[in-house]
């Protein structure tokens, strides 16, 4: 085995074969970092046949003017069941970054620690407890089992829907009542989904602005999304949910015709048997349904007059590799939330994953706080409703490469606080 620099193709070919690689460890992210002017390295291990058997993208930024801080975001990509390979890689990685005047190195492997449900109850251990002792023996310090959202540390909890051996109907059956109801609702309410082009990304950004204002969270800059769309190429999809009013109004009119037939039948039943309570109740219920239907028709006609035949209502930003669909971000028009466009977006992408044989549908980060007072309690409830599971990852590890200067660096940081 030998530690070596990799070409972009070698790196991409390998990471696309590994079933547990994160989108930050793919060629598109390397191209993005290079375009942004970030010092970037592609390194890995090759076996005696010159085949890549481990890889990672490393970035480096200046610290204390003359040193560098190296980071492998969700790396390395490696078979963590091969303990000998893991030991060799991390040992060689330290030697490599030392040659580039590294002050300290951070890694946060895309490696599950344990599995939980959305009540926070542990349902299983991933079998990777040994990694903590292994990395400690190599001089890496674990940063702890933190919860919540941190500007430096990667989120440690993901909400993931396992799609292995499941049909779309299976997924629908396993949803809770609200998710199931809204998914069926958008299917019959004229809500359509298409993918946005690069030029149309401002539509997505407008929804993100609406959502960030309503839910009071700080969103990324426009450039974050635009640059990833550009450099990740086909690995980013931005589905847009919109209403086609011609189709929606036609569906509502068809629904009204059925309701009118049922209503007339109820009237005839009452005429035949005035004491028939069941027929009277049915008549009242149908009157309510007809009233609601007419309100929807009126709303649809008014909105069509205001916006034209198509009205965008929700969009999402998804990042894809051969083994995972990641729901990175999404936003909805506050004014038209009642059309449940976000459910159409999720349903479209769940079906995309199933059709492309992708077994992991990642709703992405949650805080790890499963209490009702959690800052993301509503988000947790939404993701739980799809019958997703929670994966807790091992977390961050730091290795000081130049120990004396690293200690000075930490002291200076504390003084600045």
Curated annotation (Swiss-Prot):
Matches recorded under SUPFAM superfamilies: Acyl-CoA N-acyltransferases (Nat), tRNA-binding arm
Gene3D superfamilies: 1.20.58.90, 3.40.630.30
Keywords: Acyltransferase, Cell shape, Cell wall biogenesis/degradation, Cytoplasm, Peptidoglycan synthesis, Transferase
PROSITE patterns (UniProt xref): FEMABX
Catalytic reaction annotation: beta-D-GlcNAc-(1->4)-Mur2Ac(oyl-L-Ala-D-isoglutaminyl-L-Lys-(N(6)-Gly)-D-Ala-D-Ala)-di-trans,octa-cis-undecaprenyl diphosphate + 2 glycyl-tRNA(Gly) = MurNAc-L-Ala-D-isoglutaminyl-L-Lys-(N(6)-tri-Gly)-D-Ala-D-Ala-diphospho-di-trans,octa-cis-undecaprenyl-GlcNAc + 2 tRNA(Gly) + 2 H(+)
Domain of life: Bacteria
GO MF annotation, one: nucleotide binding
Enzyme Commission (EC) number: 2.3.2.17
Record family assignment: Belongs to the FemABX family.
PANTHER family per record: AMINOACYLTRANSFERASE FEMA, LIPID II:GLYCINE GLYCYLTRANSFERASE
Protein name: Aminoacyltransferase FemA
Organism: Staphylococcus epidermidis
């Amino acid at each position: 085995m030998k530690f070596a620099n990799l070409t972009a193709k070698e790196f991409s070919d390998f990471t696309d074969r590994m079933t547990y690689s994160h989108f930050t460890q793919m060629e598109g992210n390397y191209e993005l970092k290079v375009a942004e002017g970030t010092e970037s390295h592609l390194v890995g291990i090759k076996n005696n046949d010159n085949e890549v058997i481990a890889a990672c993208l490393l970035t480096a930024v200046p610290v204390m003017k003359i040193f560098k801080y190296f980071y492998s975001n969700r790396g390395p990509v490696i078979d963590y069941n091969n303990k000998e390979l893991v030991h060799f890689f991390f040992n060689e990685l330290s030697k490599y970054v030392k040659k580039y005047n590294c002050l300290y190195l951070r890694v946060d492997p895309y490696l599950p620690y344990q599995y939980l449900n959305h009540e926070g109850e542990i349902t299983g251990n991933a079998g990777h407890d040994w990694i903590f002792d292994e990395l400690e023996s190599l001089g890496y310090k674990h940063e702890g089992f933190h919860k919540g959202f941190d500007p430096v540390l990667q989120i440690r909890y993901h909400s993931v829907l396992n799609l292995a051996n499941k049909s779309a109907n299976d997924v629908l059956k396993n949803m809770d009542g609200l998710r199931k109801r809204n998914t069926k609702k958008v299917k019959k309410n004229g809500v359509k989904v298409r993918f946005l082009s690069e030029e149309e990304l401002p539509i997505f950004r407008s929804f993100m602005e609406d959502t960030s204002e309503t839910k009071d969270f700080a969103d990324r800059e426009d450039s974050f999304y635009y640059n990833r769309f550009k450099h990740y190429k086909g690995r980013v999809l931005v589905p847009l949910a919109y209403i086609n009013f011609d189709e929606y109004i036609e569906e509502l009119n068809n629904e009204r015709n059925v309701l009118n037939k049922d209503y007339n039948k109820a009237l005839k039943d009452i005429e035949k048997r005035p004491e028939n309570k069941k027929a009277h109740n049915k008549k009242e219920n149908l009157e309510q349904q007809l009233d609601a239907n007419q309100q929807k028709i009126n709303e649809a006609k008014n909105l069509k007059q205001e916006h034209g035949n198509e009205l965008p209502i929700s969009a999402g930003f998804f990042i894809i590799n051969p083994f995972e669909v990641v729901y990175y971000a999404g936003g909805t028009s506050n004014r038209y939330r009642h059309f449940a466009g976000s459910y159409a977006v999720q349903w479209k992408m769940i079906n995309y994953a199933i059709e492309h044989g992708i077994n992991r549908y990642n709703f992405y980060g949650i805080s790890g706080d499963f209490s009702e007072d959690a800052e993301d309690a509503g988000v947790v409830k939404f993701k739980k409703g799809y019958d997703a599971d929670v994966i807790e990852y091992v977390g961050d590890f730091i290795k000081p490469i130049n120990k004396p200067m690293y200690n000075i660096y930490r002291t200076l940081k504390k003084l600045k606080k």
